[in-house]
Amino acid sequence: MRLLWGLAWVFSFCASSLQKPRLLLFSPSVVNLGTPLSVGVQLLDAPPGQEVKGSVFLRNPKGGSCSPKKDFKLSSGDDFVLLSLEVPLEDVRSCGLFDLRRAPHIQLVAQSPWLRNTAFKATETQGVNLLFSSRRGHIFVQTDQPIYNPGQRVRYRVFALDQKMRPSTDFLTITVENSHGLRVLKKEIFTSTSIFQDAFTIPDISEPGTWKISARFSDGLESNRSTHFEVKKYVLPNFEVKITPWKPYILMVPSNSDEIQLDIQARYIYGKPVQGVAYTRFALMDEQGKRTFLRGLETQAKLVEGRTHISISKDQFQAALDKINIGVRDLEGLRLYAATAVIESPGGEMEEAELTSWRFVSSAFSLDLSRTKRHLVPGAHFLLQALVQEMSGSEASNVPVKVSATLVSGSDSQVLDIQQSTNGIGQVSISFPIPPTVTELRLLVSAGSLYPAIARLTVQAPPSRGTGFLSIEPLDPRSPSVGDTFILNLQPVGIPAPTFSHYYYMIISRGQIMAMGREPRKTVTSVSVLVDHQLAPSFYFVAYFYHQGHPVANSLLINIQSRDCEGKLQLKVDGAKEYRNADMMKLRIQTDSKALVALGAVDMALYAVGGRSHKPLDMSKVFEVINSYNVGCGPGGGDDALQVFQDAGLAFSDGDRLTQTREDLSCPKEKKSRQKRNVNFQKAVSEKLGQYSSPDAKRCCQDGMTKLPMKRTCEQRAARVPQQACREPFLSCCKFAEDLRRNQTRSQAHLARNNHNMLQEEDLIDEDDILVRTSFPENWLWRVEPVDSSKLLTVWLPDSMTTWEIHGVSLSKSKGLCVAKPTRVRVFRKFHLHLRLPISIRRFEQFELRPVLYNYLNDDVAVSVHVTPVEGLCLAGGGMMAQQVTVPAGSARPVAFSVVPTAAANVPLKVVARGVFDLGDAVSKILQIEKEGAIHREELVYNLDPLNNLGRTLEIPGSSDPNIVPDGDFSSLVRVTASEPLETMGSEGALSPGGVASLLRLPQGCAEQTMIYLAPTLTASNYLDRTEQWSKLSPETKDHAVDLIQKGYMRIQQFRKNDGSFGAWLHRDSSTWLTAFVLKILSLAQEQVGNSPEKLQETASWLLAQQLGDGSFHDPCPVIHRAMQGGLVGSDETVALTAFVVIALHHGLDVFQDDDAKQLKNRVEASITKANSFLGQKASAGLLGAHAAAITAYALTLTKASEDLRNVAHNSLMAMAEETGEHLYWGLVLGSQDKVVLRPTAPRSPTEPVPQAPALWIETTAYALLHLLLREGKGKMADKAASWLTHQGSFHGAFRSTQDTVVTLDALSAYWIASHTTEEKALNVTLSSMGRNGLKTHGLHLNNHQVKGLEEELKFSLGSTISVKVEGNSKGTLKILRTYNVLDMKNTTCQDLQIEVKVTGAVEYAWDANEDYEDYYDMPAADDPSVPLQPVTPLQLFEGRRSRRRREAPKVVEEQESRVQYTVCIWRNGKLGLSGMAIADITLLSGFHALRADLEKLTSLSDRYVSHFETDGPHVLLYFDSVPTTRECVGFGASQEVVVGLVQPSSAVLYDYYSPDHKCSVFYAAPTKSQLLATLCSGDVCQCAEGKCPRLLRSLERRVEDKDGYRMRFACYYPRVEYGFTVKVLREDGRAAFRLFESKITQVLHFRKDTMASIGQTRNFLSRASCRLRLEPNKEYLIMGMDGETSDNKGDPQYLLDSNTWIEEMPSEQMCKSTRHRAACFQLKDFLMEFSSRGCQV
């Protein structure tokens, strides 16, 4: 037996010694589509003179060539070659590679007869399997800024490059995903210039989060690259706060006695320091971001030159830890959280900053050994490469590094200790010899002396030593730079007598073999590598040789230091680095080749509000993308040659050996051990939150601790929490927080003693951003400039005073892509002013304009400040009176002006500050001035039919609403059209700039409302496509339609759930009805939006799960109470819902086109059949209401149900039809076809307006029309239904609400397509009306195919009768819109719904130096704020800062910020059935804005009170899921930004969204005895404001003596009155912003329009409440003036008392008897007799 084993060993040795000829095949292990593949072929051990010819190619493993063949020729003297093999898309597609279902692999094949004939192989091929990737080239995406507000426009660029980083022109696919990961936009484009630019708008309802823009080559699915940006609500800050710790870490070792120190810095965005006070608080933060307040560490400090320093001693910190039972050893892995709020003293604005990266560590350094090889070569040197960094991430230079190396040889070991310091970039490279017998190396590495960082690493020797090893040692272990020559030494190890003659090597970078070479073997063989840009940012050096027939290999990963681009791009601002706003700036762009340079400038304030987390494109990101093509894994080396090749990213075959087939592009992740955390930490950190383990329970607890902006007991709040599991922690934590508030004492002494005992409640709840206001651009210079070496760009800077960061990216055909280092430009004025205006204000309200002057000069500045005169504003001295102000050096000062607006318009308000030598500044902003009262709208529709003798002429009476504001802008807008389809579907209707959404005059907050952006536009596009009428509209209309559809699609995706369903709100459960609605619309929009069919298939699958056994569908969370629409509660609701889902599923069948979806499609079809059976049974019963009957008939007809079912449904529907003349409609039926709510009206006269039906009737009739069109086509019944619907449209083309509008436009579109004709018909309309200047006449000549002049919009006096004459052979429509402001809302429809708004709170304007802020620290009055004596409690600071959008701090010689509390109460009549959603629209008092934090509490907490809120200018919209039958109130705070006096009442409206006619409108006023009702103006400003006010004259005053005929001149010459009465005042009544004096006529002197005036009749006289005029009851007055435009509720004229009115108090008989007054009385009596009998004689 021993002999046999010996012979076997000798035989194997001899066999291995024979060096047989081989063909070696090398390639990257990944093939990229369209990118040439580098292939290395080598001939090994061939006899001299032998020549080998062959070719290489790619093929599908199943067969079929995937590339052209590439020939090669090798010989013993020329034994290797590097080939480039093309991988064309066409060949890959034709070979069937895309059809492979699993990870696609492709074979690299070398084919040569030599392999069969000489190498003794069975075939003439030799190959290796490669992983195929569709990734190719490089794509970079750039946005114009890192963070956006919802509703903002995002501009982006896509740079497309090939594998060599050169411009590529190709097809790209671009997608946008929202913060939920849902795709909201997809585009297929072709880049002709390699730079593609586009933009899209973020929906205004988007939730905060991170969005993503991705781009890929259309044929390369894996070439996807993306960039991220943040979406959240913010406004640019005026200044930025930074927290800088002295050390980026906190040592947690017991012996460390260092203080915790940090610096606070606050600077304006334009670079100047902020004066003010900093309030800082601290907490412990765990890995999940949960914070626990550290009591007793709160600090407040004065800023000096914008800076302050905070120091916490070890004892202070330890005391804070003791209070929460935390030891120092428990801190590892945690962070110390610091938050600072800075309040600046001049303007009182507050900004915040957080520090979240301050870690507790056991060492000051981090130690990284990832660059050290995991394989050692016994007998050679081992290279340990370590990177030492400070905890901040910066390189740690000159840090001692100690290495303890344990060399293990069997059971023996020896320890080697080495010490070396890091170089300038924190690197250390230590080389030490490894004895040949070593099998394992254990490394213990420490960095630093005191408290070192420690790392451990175990390195194994290869298991087999028979073939020896190859050692690769760099001559210089440091990383090379581009341009360096990198030298590596090669040496065989463990081979006593090497027989090979050459080393072979390869250089691999960017996923390709960049070079192959060989070097003759020497004792030490050196290889030189020239490092160029093509090798950056890293490359593998792989060397190998064959020994005894076995490959021996090693590799090394070399990182390149230089991160510069191949070309050159520099941005330089010529001249000064500091500019003034609106200056001209010269930007010099320098390149080293001809290139396109893409520019962009970003306001650096964006980084202060959260944009730092999304850094702009830079070269590090570029190299990261380039390096992603590196298919190698690890630092190099391996147990054997195959692993060396494989880990370097190579595939290899020598005929006998083969590397493993790669299965994935990514590398296997190294397993890391994780230190176990203290399980008891959370309980110790939070005494209350620690009681709950689940995240949901913790959130409920947090919600319970949050204080609401209105009073509710904890029990009341908990009752509103729907989930039982949430209710208990919510109630417990709510009571816990209430106890804290109840125990609070506001005394200063108590606070000083016990402040450390208060719980910082804010750390239990997420932080809110505090928003500030701005009106300046956030980015600009978004342009692409062609540059040839150099270009000087001249641009004008925006008006912002800030620091701009200018970015540049160049793209060159010769040098590729280069990202410039950003350059910054500071825009600043050393003297400037800041101006803030109210959102809006009403006429004759008074407000205080307070511009703040900033002086950063070294000297005091004396300036003159004035407001430029403008019509419509009353200003001091008419605007020419200036205030002389001295602003001390380095400080700020406010200046006050009182302003009274007198005109309802948008007025430019300009403030100018000017000093000597042209020193000064000017700011102009638009002041929005509104009319008094509330807006009222009234619409009328008339049918024009010249073929009807009775309808050829008609009289339209004027409006006589007694509540009209007397001197408003009264008019009636008249619109006439002869082409209803083009008006409704064209650029004035569904395709108007905002779509139908802008025409509805309703909000678009919830998911269903969002669909109004999409559905009507799709309908209109379909109509115009089918009738080929796009050419009749403007050329850009089609593009606008596509844009509207894209926006609607993007918006609705914000409501999608992960399972494909949709809910009315993001926080609300999914709705069957709404999900079906979305499925139907998005199925129709597939082509326009490029939606993924799989997503809609998920939606359809969710709907199928909602079907019950009887075929009906149920809705777990209804959006609308459909019982309202069917009649019978429950039964009809289910029928209508089922029919609705059937319609949606039928339209959704188009998304099941692929084979994978065939099974789901069959399920959908079966579901429709089952549902149709249910609908047929209900229709046969004959008990359906009109709406349920109509939608059922349409669903059965649409899905082609059995004829019997369709007939039953049709007959049931037609039995409920109401026919009036040429109109057919369906009203609301309660439960059977003979029980109608509203009996059909008798045929009306053509001269009467068309009655406007409720939304439900319109929707029902629309479904009936759709059914009739499918059943009978365009017949007589369809004509009548379409005619009725046509005349139900509003003035702007929409209907009542969303559903009736969507369905009706769908129905009318289908009808108009069926009835479309090219026949031209004409309509001539003449309109005439009497005006002040006589008869006004308009003649219109229209036809049914007009585009330009399609419709005319005319304006007539509101009270005038309009006469209409109609001629021609075409029918038409005349619509009238009356819009005016009303005095009060006493006669509104507040019978069904009720709303009440109350405003409470102290509103003070007194300049008080001892202001008390319960939400902040008290500050003494001084020019420079000092540290306050009395601190705020943690709970107060938390609640105070969460209740504001922006805080006005205590100001020097400035008013306290005014706050009020709004309480909104709603309820309804118990008999009223509502659709389920109501909206309260509250117009805020002038000068106020709602506190967003308060509104968010109403919507975001577990005890949700409001479903959603929106703010739009002065409006706050609150969405309620339902209106209770009992009074329910919500509250929120409002803050006054601008001081306003004589504040007028504002309006509030509560209405049913789906039936807006159900509404309640009320006025509410400011708090009584409030300073809001005080007069702010004085002197000439008040005189100007009262210039339009009437003046009361007294007959017995000498100046009124009529010796010179003063009264007669006033009456007959100027202004020449139109009426004259003597009246006795009966009473005075307040009407919004007016006072009404009801008076009885005692004598008629003169009249023009008031022909019915007689003694004893009453007339109303109105005066503005802002005027000082008072007419006393029971006194008699002479009043003469101009006729009014309005009437009272009896139809009698009412008169406005203004500056053109004569008002004289009549003397009593007793006074006229006195001798002193007798003459004056006679003169008055003579005037009355003469004027009444003779009038004016001119």
From Swiss-Prot:
PROSITE patterns for this protein: ALPHA_2_MACROGLOBULIN, ANAPHYLATOXIN_1, ANAPHYLATOXIN_2, NTR
Species assigned in the record: Mus musculus (Mouse)
GO biological process, one term: inflammatory response
Name the UniProt record assigns to this protein: Complement C4-B
Glycosylation site positions: N224, N743, N1324, N1387
Ranges of residues in domain Anaphylatoxin-like: 700-734
Keyword Disulfide bond: yes
Residues flagged as site, Cleavage: R753, N754
All residue ranges annotated as the NTR domain in the record: 1589-1736
Domain of life, source organism: Eukaryota
GO (cellular component) term, any one: synapse
Disulphide linkage map: C66-C95, C633-C667, C700-C726, C701-C733, C714-C734, C1465-C1529, C1577-C1582, C1589-C1667, C1612-C1736, C1712-C1721
Modification comment: Prior to secretion, the single-chain precursor is enzymatically cleaved by plasminogen (PLG) to yield non-identical chains alpha, beta and gamma. During activation of the complement systems, the alpha chain is cleaved into C4a and C4b by different proteases depending on the complement pathway: C4b stays linked to the beta and gamma chains, while C4a is released in the plasma. The alpha chain is cleaved by C1S to generate C4a and C4b following activation by the classical complement system.
Miscellaneous section: C4 is a major histocompatibility complex class-III protein.
Secretion signal span: 1-19
GO molecular function: endopeptidase inhibitor activity
Keyword terms of this UniProt record: Cleavage on pair of basic residues, Complement pathway, Disulfide bond, Glycoprotein, Immunity, Inflammatory response, Innate immunity, Phosphoprotein, Secreted, Signal, Sulfation, Thioester bond
Subunit-structure text: In absence of complement activation, circulates in blood as a disulfide-linked trimer of an alpha, beta and gamma chain.
Lineage: Eukaryota, Metazoa, Chordata, Craniata, Vertebrata
Isoglutamyl cysteine thioester (Cys-Gln) cross-link, chain position(s): C1006-Q1009
Xref: InterPro entries: A-macroglobulin_rcpt-bd (IPR009048), A-macroglobulin_rcpt-bd_sf (IPR036595), A2M/Complement_sys (IPR050473), A2M_N_BRD (IPR011625), Alpha-macroglob_thiol-ester_cl (IPR047565), Alpha-macroglobulin_TED (IPR011626), Anaphylatoxin/fibulin (IPR000020), Anaphylatoxin_comp_syst (IPR018081)
Localization per Swiss-Prot or TrEMBL: Secreted
Function per UniProt: Precursor of non-enzymatic components of the classical, lectin and GZMK complement pathways, which consist in a cascade of proteins that leads to phagocytosis and breakdown of pathogens and signaling that strengthens the adaptive immune system.
Primary residence: secreted
Propeptide: 674-677, 1444-1447
Transcription among keywords: no
